[in-house]
């Protein structure tokens, strides 16, 4: 089997699981272009997010308050993961699908 060159490798979300580490909700694991795996814990178990409460106005306030977290341009960071998985779509499944698309296209505009 031929190996892909380093240039053709991209960051890839490998798994999203409930976190076993308190106080986090989820753990996202990524395969990085250098061949290493990186896991990030994010979300707080004791607090609601958009996938739980479904309040659009509350979601918009969260996005306004946390837009600065996206300045890092690093989708592995907890702020990115919270914004695009917990506060993006009404379901985690829908948000995860959108996050994978954004990761593929490198499109990090604010959720609408």
Segments (PLM) and residue ranges:
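Extended terminal accessory/targeting regions
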Residues: 1-112
